[in-house]
């Protein structure tokens, strides 16, 4: 397959290098990734300033470019410029830390894959769910095995897979729902050496979903969480209720 690999941790990150090198053992791999950390940039794109792209070296088997853009920019550039619109699969990752619950709305990793889904290209976001001790190689090897088994024709149009891999021994995988996992944010006030106040966002994770088949519970129990998601955000149940009342 011709595979595009991107991420939001930057082209220098270990996660994308390990993933690209392992995938290139069996596939034709192209890497187009941000030239610096772009975590939590969501699905932002660059439209008011130029995008710069520079060829870089990862390995002999991988064609790689860094860009000044976001993960979504990287996918657009790669598809239209680097790969001449011939892409069989897009993989975003391996991310350092989980992308579960409401995190996916902020995640550049997920948005890179979602950009591919919006083009109706098979796309996967993959994260090593342990931020402090990420197992990039374990996540990448899981993905390689998964690709040999999974039938992408089972996915609805414009749908991607969000994969979170636990650290340590993997018991198997589960197809899961996006959870209600979210953050309770607060801001720490600090003072610069020049006497100016600034703020640093902090937070505590909230995991209170009462459903059993959600992403973080699978990971907590040692299973890889695989969640099919799409860019269509309409709340269908609420829409039906509103129409019944007001139409």
UniProtKB/Swiss-Prot annotation:
Binds 1 Mg(2+) ion per subunit. In contrast to other surE homologs, is essentially inactive with other divalent cations. Pfam families: SurE (PF01975). Mg(2+) binds at residues 8-9, 39, 95. The keyword Cell division does not apply. GO terms for molecular function: 3'-nucleotidase activity; 5'-nucleotidase activity; exopolyphosphatase activity; metal ion binding; nucleotide binding. Its EC number is 3.1.3.5. Keywords: Cytoplasm, Hydrolase, Magnesium, Metal-binding, Nucleotide-binding. Signal peptide: none annotated. Optimum temperature is 80 degrees Celsius. Active up to 95 degrees Celsius. It catalyses: a ribonucleoside 5'-phosphate + H2O = a ribonucleoside + phosphate. Its cofactor is Mg(2+). It is found in: Cytoplasm. Its main location: cytoplasm. GO terms for cellular component: cytoplasm. Optimum pH is 5.5-6.2. Inhibited by vanadate and tungstate. It comes from the Bacteria. The keyword Transmembrane does not apply. InterPro entries: SurE, SurE-like_Pase/nucleotidase, SurE-like_sf. Changing residue 8 to N: Loss of activity. Homodimer and possibly homotetramer. Nucleotidase that preferentially dephosphorylates 5'-GMP and 5'-AMP. Belongs to the SurE nucleotidase family. This is 5'-nucleotidase SurE. It comes from Thermotoga maritima (strain ATCC 43589 / DSM 3109 / JCM 10099 / NBRC 100826 / MSB8).
């Amino acid at each position: 397959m011709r595979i595009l690999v991107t991420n939001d941790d930057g082209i220098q990150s270990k996660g994308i290098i390990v993933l690209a090198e392992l995938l290139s053992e069996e596939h034709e791999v192209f890497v187009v990734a941000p030239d610096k950390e772009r975590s939590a940039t969501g699905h932002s794109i660059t439209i008011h300033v130029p995008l710069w792209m520079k060829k870089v070296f990862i390995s002999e088997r991988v064609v790689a470019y860094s860009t000044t853009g976001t993960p979504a920019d990287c996918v657009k550039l790669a598809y239209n410029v680097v790969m001449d619109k011939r892409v069989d699969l897009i993989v975003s990752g391996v991310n350092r830390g989980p992308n579960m619950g409401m995190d996916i709305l902020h995640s550049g990793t997920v948005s890179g894959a979602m950009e591919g889904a919006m083009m109706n290209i098979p796309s996967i976001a993959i994260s090593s769910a342990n931020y402090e001790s990420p197992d990039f190689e374990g996540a990448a090897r899981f993905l390689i095995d998964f690709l040999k088994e999974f039938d992408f024709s089972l996915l609805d149009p414009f749908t991607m897979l969000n994969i979170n891999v636990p650290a340590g021994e993997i018991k198997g995988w589960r197809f899961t729902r996006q959870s209600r996992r979210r953050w309770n944010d607060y801001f720490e006030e600090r003072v610069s050496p020049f006497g100016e106040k600034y703020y640093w966002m902090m937070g505590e994770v909230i995991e209170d979903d009462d459903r059993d088949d959600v992403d973080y519970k699978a990971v907590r129990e040692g299973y890889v969480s695989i969640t099919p998601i799409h860019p269509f955000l309409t709340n269908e149940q609420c829409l039906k209720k509103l129409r019944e009342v007001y139409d």
